[in-house]
């Protein structure tokens, strides 16, 4: 299936969650028992599905991201994209990899110095709290980085809710049990 404006348009095979721009139901799935609202408001918008991609090594992930981000820039040249990571070391790894791939309009964000210009900004999830981007890519969402703990669930919630249009999730190795459970729940019929 090919969708305009998403990473599927370049041939990635993905696992799709039931909804894209996170609606209260999807937010509840991500938060689990930590949901703060007893009755979340109804969502008034829908969007492309959440896309989850698993890789065997970081190099393959970076190469695929570079290809997908180049395609996205051609289709939506004014889009703002945040590549959000669990920590500074992962941010540096992905930033260097995308620099080597010669991705245009790429910026490394430190100390919340976001430009909000079209292009790709790489930073840690914690730095993006309270901000929104057209596309958000949560990278390295593996079991080691995000174990099934309340702090991990909260951090993933912060990252996932930054996306206005679409959320992409990548993982090298074993997917976080939190995300695996959320995807499983979102794919069940009501």
Predicted regions and their residues:
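Polar low-complexity intrinsically disordered regions enriched in Ser/Thr and small residues
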Residues: 8-9, 35, 50
């Amino acid at each position: 299936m090919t969708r305009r404006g998403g990473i599927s348009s370049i041939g990635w095979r993905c696992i799709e969650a039931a909804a894209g721009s996170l609606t209260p139901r999807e937010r509840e799935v991500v938060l689990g028992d930590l949901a703060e609202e007893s009755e979340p408001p109804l969502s008034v918008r829908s969007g492309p599905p959440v896309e989850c991609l698993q890789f065997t090594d970081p190099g393959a992930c970076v190469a695929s991201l570079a290809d997908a981000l180049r395609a996205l820039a051609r289709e939506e040249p004014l889009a703002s994209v945040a590549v959000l990571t669990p920590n500074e070391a992962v941010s540096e790894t992905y930033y260097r990899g995308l620099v080597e791939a010669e991705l245009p309009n790429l910026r490394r964000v430190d100390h919340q110095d976001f430009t909000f210009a079209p292009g790709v900004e790489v930073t840690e999830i914690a730095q993006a709290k309270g901000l929104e981007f057209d596309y958000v890519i949560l990278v390295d969402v593996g079991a080691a980085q995000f174990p099934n703990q309340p702090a991990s669930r909260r951090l993933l919630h912060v990252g996932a809710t930054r996306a206005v249009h679409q959320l992409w999730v990548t993982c090298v190795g074993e997917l976080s049990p939190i995300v695996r459970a959320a995807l499983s729940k979102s794919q069940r019929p009501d």
